[in-house]
Curated annotation (Swiss-Prot):
GO molecular function, one term: amino acid binding
Similarity comment text for this entry: Belongs to the aspartate/ornithine carbamoyltransferase superfamily. OTCase family.
SUPFAM superfamilies, sorted: Aspartate/ornithine carbamoyltransferase (SSF53671)
Gene that specifies this protein: argF
Upper classification of the organism: Bacteria, Pseudomonadati, Pseudomonadota, Gammaproteobacteria, Pasteurellales
Main location: cytoplasm
A biological process from GO: citrulline biosynthetic process
Keywords: Amino-acid biosynthesis, Arginine biosynthesis, Cytoplasm, Transferase
Stretch forming the signal peptide: none
Protein name: Ornithine carbamoyltransferase
Originating species: Actinobacillus pleuropneumoniae serotype 5b (strain L20)
Length: 334
């Protein structure tokens, strides 16, 4: 079957079929191999891409910029301090301006409704670099990383996301696993599980793909036999430190420790994290948390000994952001 993803948005993966997602993963693999072999061909020469960042980023910005440069495209980085977006100009008007100058627009920010509005009015492909609800480029990188680190067929790979499951990573891992027919498990305190509406939508996708979905607060049920353990930060950096106490108390049993990794019963289990991770007290935030909560001096959502172990494939994930983002741009713009 021939695929035509030309001029397609990437907003959440909700509207991408299983075969379209697999096509992007295959293209990511091919582009990665070409880069490693020195045989990459530039297919985006003459293309201009706007990168709108209302939230700061290291991996997403670098991945988009390097992917674009590798393919011969040019990018313009737009941050909140250097634009009129939201201050003197609406996103609707911004979309109609940038759509006349650029071949595509990336957006990283807050509400999903904003990137949807951008896509509605820009007239060019729009790529979601992260919103509060979804993180689709991260999911493509995550699945590529799991494929590379597991000999099983995709449909037999099992993974758990453990921690605060109401965020964009928890939502998106549930979604892509359901789309691709995987064994996906979401584990969190009951108050921090995904919204019922999202779970119901993903169960419908799972019925079509053959995916197995588990959403639970029971750790042993969730981690048993999994190939990969995912987590993410427990709190957003915009939240005051004083408000972390209740969240930390709730999530402490869900911290990824060597003991939790052993509870999987899989000696080959791998650890995954979208990064940045608070795995020690060397960062400013990590130090502040450790001073207030000494039990977290060795890491918040994951401990230092897990993060620095051979089980950690988070840096492969980070690299794969670039290869998968490149695939999204090539599929849409080449």
């Amino acid at each position: 079957m021939a695929f035509n993803l030309k001029n397609r948005h990437l907003l959440s993966l909700v509207n991408h079929t299983e075969r379209e997602i697999k096509f992007l993963l295959d293209l990511s693999r091919d582009l990665k191999r070409a880069k490693y072999a020195g045989t990459e061909q530039q297919r985006l020469k003459g293309k201009n891409i706007a990168l709108i960042f209302e939230k700061t980023s290291t991996r997403t910005r670098c991945a988009f910029e390097v992917a674009a440069y590798d393919q011969g495209a040019h990018v313009t980085y737009i941050d909140p301090t250097s634009s009129q977006i939201g201050h003197k100009e609406s996103m609707k008007d911004t979309a109609r301006v940038l759509g006349r100058m650029y071949d595509a627009i990336e957006y990283r920010g807050f509400k999903q409704s904003v990137v949807n509005e951008l896509a509605e009015y820009a007239g060019v492909p729009v790529f979601n670099g992260l919103t509060d609800e979804f993180h689709p480029t991260q999911m493509l990188a995550d699945v590529l990383t799991m494929i590379e680190n597991c000999e099983k067929p995709l449909s037999q790979i099992s993974y758990v996301y453990i921690g605060d499951a109401r965020n964009n990573v928890g939502n998106s891992l549930l979604l892509i696993g359901a789309k691709l027919g995987m064994d996906v498990r979401i584990c969190a305190p009951k108050a921090l599980l995904p919204e019922d509406s999202l779970v119901e939508m993903c169960q419908k996708f799972a019925a079509e793909s053959g995916a197995r979905i588990t959403v639970t607060d029971d750790i042993d049920t969730a981690v048993k036999g999994v190939d990969f353990v995912h987590t993410d930060v427990w709190v957003s950096m915009g939240e005051p430190l004083e408000t972390w106490g209740e969240r930390i108390d709730m999530l402490m049993p869900y911290q990824v420790t060597p003991e939790l990794m052993k509870r999987t019963g899989n000696p080959k289990v791998k650890f995954m994290h979208c990064l940045p991770a608070f795995h020690n007290s060397e960062t400013k935030i990590g130090k502040q948390v450790a001073e207030k909560y000494p039990a977290l001096a060795n890491g918040i959502e994951v401990t230092e000994d897990v993060f620095e172990s051979p089980a950690n494939v988070a840096f492969e994930q980070a690299e794969n952001r670039m290869h998968t983002i490149k695939a999204v741009m090539v599929a849409s713009l080449a």
